[in-house]
Amino acid sequence: MLVGCLGGNLENDISYPGDVMYESTNATIVEVWEDGAVVETTYPVLSFDFNESSAPSAFLSYTVRGTHVDETVDASQTTVVNVEFKHHGFHTLELIADYEDTTDERGDDSRHLNEIVVRIEKRIEWRESSTNEPMPMTLDSRHEVGDRPPSVLVLASTVHNPALIANLGGGQEVEVLWELIDNTQEACQFQPGTVKDGESASWNTVHFNTDEVHDLRVTYEEGQDTIDVDHTVDIQYEALETVPTA
């Protein structure tokens, strides 16, 4: 973590935005899909409290700034900057506290500046109900900010074969095949399974070739019972974020 100041001659007892309090420097975006369409996206919000910062004159504003975020608050109204994150990856953020010029500021901007790193991951929840032709789930796990790709994809998939309510002809087993398809249209991982009537079967795996697009596919023979499909995919990064201060 880098600590410093821009402009002015500050005394040694002046606090920098290194005194900014933040309880967390990592969070997760959650995206929910139903029957092939996004129905909800929850973006995490992290808070940065400049209450412990001090300067030779009154603060004017507090700012948290990065490639995809830029939030400023009036220092006379609050010391807390709430930042919403919409991109997964490593965000390098500047914590800026601007204060009034004093007679010894030499005409420069008066501010304290600190830099931290925040890790934002992503979870995708996918559900299809009563389908006899499951759709491929496209997974674009390429990092959206920063220079480092995700460290791993964690996949958990469950196929449920609902029991027939009106048991006229009886339910049947369903033979399924899970495949993780890479950008060459080859299956880099796969798993066959059998789902009995009224039961479920799951495939859990991890994948480390993360900086490309994949399809997660579930296929089964035509004429079998309709099925429900649930996927959960976590796009995870190595824990390289700045340590929280609160």
Predicted feature descriptions by range:
Residues M1-Y22:
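Secretory targeting signatures
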Residues V69-Q77:
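Short beta-strand segments within Ig-like beta-sandwich modules, predominantly Fibronectin type-III
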Residues D101, G170-T184, H207-A246:
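C-terminal edge strands of extracellular/lumenal beta-sandwich accessory domains
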Residues E133-K196:
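Acidic, Ser/Thr/Pro-rich low-complexity intrinsically disordered segments
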Residues V81-H87:
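Residue-level recognition of secondary-structure-to-loop junctions
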Residues L93-A97:
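Hydrophobic/tyrosine-rich beta-strand signature of extracellular beta-sandwich/beta-rich modules
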Residues V45-S57, T158-H160:
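Acidic, Ser/Thr
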Residues T102-H143, C188, Q236-A246:
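Non-catalytic extracellular/lumenal accessory regions of secreted precursors
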